């Protein structure tokens, strides 16, 4: 069985933790009654081994094994610097 590793792209909200970042993932959801598209954000904690990210950076993260209670994503690359 081959599972595709999930990758997401988002904006770094916080890098105050050591070797960890908080990434905001934005998605658009259609309102069930009115049909308007609404922005929804999900905050994900990710592992940043080299502490290279700053707040405002656009990054790519991928899913991995659980690294702590809240971290199960790791940094792949920094797409654009803030």
UniProtKB/Swiss-Prot annotation:
InterPro entries hit by this protein: NA-bd_OB-fold, Ribosomal_uS17, Ribosomal_uS17_bact/chlr, Ribosomal_uS17_CS
GO molecular function: rRNA binding; structural constituent of ribosome
SUPFAM superfamilies in the record: Nucleic acid-binding proteins
Biological processes, Gene Ontology terms: translation
This protein's UniProt keywords: Ribonucleoprotein, Ribosomal protein, RNA-binding, rRNA-binding
Keyword hit for Ribosomal protein: yes
Organism superkingdom: Bacteria
GO cellular component, one term: cytosolic small ribosomal subunit
Gene3D superfamilies linked to this entry: Nucleic acid-binding proteins
Pfam families, A to Z: Ribosomal_S17
UniProt record similarity statement: Belongs to the universal ribosomal protein uS17 family.
Function, in words: One of the primary rRNA binding proteins, it binds specifically to the 5'-end of 16S ribosomal RNA.
Subunit description: Part of the 30S ribosomal subunit.
Protein name: Small ribosomal subunit protein uS17
Organism classification: Bacteria, Pseudomonadati, Pseudomonadota, Gammaproteobacteria, Alteromonadales
């Amino acid at each position: 069985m081959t599972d595709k590793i999930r990758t997401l792209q988002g904006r770094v909200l916080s890098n105050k933790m050591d070797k960890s970042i908080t990434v905001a993932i934005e998605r658009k959801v259609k309102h069930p009654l009115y049909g308007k598209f609404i922005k929804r954000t999900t905050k994900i904690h990710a592992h940043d081994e080299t502490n290279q990210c700053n707040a405002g950076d656009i990054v790519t993260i991928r899913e991995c094994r659980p690294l702590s209670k809240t971290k199960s994503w790791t940094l792949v690359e920094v797409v654009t610097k803030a």
